[in-house]
């Protein structure tokens, strides 16, 4: 039986994975942090300021982010980086290559754009539904500060739908990772996978796909464990079964 971890252009696939996988995980991690932080912040702002121009603008931006293809967003950011270089003579936003500094910014923004927009939209909807709940009105009538109500009653109960959006967004980021890495020449597992497909290296393709599939499994497993912690209904069901 042949091992799926053969050779990629004379280099063992395991060696290629050891080189490329940390770069892909780093890019995914930074993009996920950007997406969750920006999405939650913008979603909270849109919900707190509902019926205002700020809320309408944020919702329009989130709809635009969801509907914009990632490769088109990548092309726009590359154009911006080239334009800034032509104007300033400095590589403020490098459009290709590897580095844990400015090189990371553009691919991370492309990976984070659509997930951030999705988190913004769903967190806005979830927060609005909870803010109109009876227990939130009771908390207001007791004179609790808006910040306390938001943190203790609203955000805590919006955790499950927001987590669902984050998980779906992370799956989407994993799916488009090879394209983004290839566009920005980021030397991660996605770029190595597309290169192996181009040269028809079957062993390398299989060896590159397996870690990506394993990442999907790990994401789903972690999500299920978090659901058990965040959803009281699942905790009660587990306690009843015991």
Residue ranges and their predicted role:
Residues 60-91, 110-116, 121:
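Membrane-water interface segments at the C-terminal ends of transmembrane alpha-helices
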């Amino acid at each position: 039986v042949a091992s799926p971890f053969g050779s990629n252009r004379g280099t063992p696939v395991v060696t290629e994975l050891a080189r490329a996988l940390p770069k892909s995980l780093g890019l995914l991690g930074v993009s996920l942090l950007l997406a969750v932080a920006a999405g939650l912040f913008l979603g909270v702002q849109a919900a707190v300021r509902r019926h205002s121009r700020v809320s309408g603008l944020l919702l329009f931006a989130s709809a635009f982010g969801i509907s914009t293809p990632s490769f088109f967003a990548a092309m726009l950011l590359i154009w911006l980086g080239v334009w800034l270089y032509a104007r300033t003579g400095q590589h403020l936003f490098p459009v290709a290559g590897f580095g844990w500094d400015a090189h990371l910014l553009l691919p991370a923004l492309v990976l984070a754009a659509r997930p951030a927009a999705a988190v913004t939209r769903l967190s806005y909807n979830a927060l609005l539904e909870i803010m109109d709940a009876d227990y939130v009105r009771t908390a207001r009538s007791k004179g609790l500060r808006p910040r306390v109500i938001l943190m203790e009653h609203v955000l805590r109960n919006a955790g499950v739908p927001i987590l669902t959006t984050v998980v779906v967004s992370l799956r989407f980021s994993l799916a488009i990772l090879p394209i983004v890495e290839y566009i920005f020449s980021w030397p991660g597992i996605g770029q190595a996978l597309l290169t192996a497909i181009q040269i028809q290296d079957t062993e390398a393709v299989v060896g590159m796909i397996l870690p990506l599939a394993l990442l999907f499994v790990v994401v789903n497993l972690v999500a299920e464990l978090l659901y058990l912690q965040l959803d009281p209904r699942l905790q009660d069901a587990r306690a009843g079964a015991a």
